[in-house]
Amino acid sequence: NGTKIAFLREGQLWKMNPDGTGRVKLTNSKIGIEGFSFSPDGKKVILIKSLPYHGSIQKNPDDLPKATGRLVTDLNYRHWDHYVESMPHPFVATFDGQTVKVQKDLLEGEPYECPMMPFGGVEQLAWSPNSKTIAYTCRKKTGVNYAISTDSDIYLYDVASGSTKNLCKPEGYKDPEINATKTMKTQAVNHQQGDLNMGYDTNPQFSPDGKYVAWQSMKNNGYESDRNRLCVYNLATGEKKYVAEKFDSNVDAFCWNADSKTLYFIGCWHACINMYQTNLNGDVRALTDDWMDFGSIQMLGNTGKILASRHSISQADELYVITP
């Protein structure tokens, strides 16, 4: 309701007054909380927790209980600087204003991660405006297929029923076989027919009227440096539109206008990250043309203005308000 500030401290969720007083601990989780997102009605909250996972690494095998080594049996066993011995899962919980309880794992029994490691955060999940649905990002693959694939999808989770729908693939879709020893470019997975999303699909956001979900979308599987497009999905018809195609570069971040017809995004052009506007018809226009970089973007409440950070080679990050 805008009267409290929620924050994480030592792996637990807290709330306080805007002046820093009245700090109250809301959770007492045995597993540390890594991220959170309250529903628009304030009655539910998403909690990110990492669960133990030993699908590819067996630590301290039974016959060597004092060993510190790891027995690796499959990919993917490591992300950059850490071994894959845990996996983040999103939990949805009820909140009565004082305590968080009745937690349910959105991926219960599934050996997948959400948010996606190693860089994903709570921005990979989003509440619908009516607080009944969660859109989340997930790459539902394991082993070698997980390690060589960039094919993540956007899923809709119905909080009441627990049902899940994939917005990127039709029901019953099965991946074609992939030869891990050859380039993905020439394989069948990147030559699909129909409106399939085969690359990275991440960071969903519902439109304010709840009729659309937008997300960043790459076209090809196995191509980590593919161009990030801006995909808009019509929840009533299932139609997808890519509304930033007239901008020949990446969509780095975006947000919806309150009218649910206009979107703002930032992207790099000629070595500068500026701000742009598009609509459901894909009519793109530049809002800024600065020799600086915008690093984040969001709407400033219901004012119709945009709040963004901006920096340059000679200036640290500052917050700016932009009137489109």
Q: What is each of the regions a protein language model found here?
A:
Residues 47-109, 137-140, 144-155, 184-189, ...:
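Predominantly five- to eight-bladed beta-propeller fold
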Residues 8-9, 82-87, 145-152, 222-228, ...:
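Short, solvent-exposed loop/turn segments at conserved positions within beta-propeller repeat blades
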Residues 11-58:
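Hydrophobic or amphipathic alpha-helical targeting/insertion segments
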Residues 2-5, 45-46, 134, 210-213, ...:
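Hydrophobic beta-strand positions that form the internal "hydrophobic ladder"
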Residues 1, 16-32, 94-121, 146-150, ...:
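Multi-bladed beta-propeller domains
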Residues 1, 40-41, 129-130, 208-209, ...:
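Residue-level detector of Asp-centered blade-edge/turn motifs that repeat once per structural unit
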Residues 37, 126, 205, 255, ...:
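Conserved beta-strand position repeated across blades of beta-propeller domains
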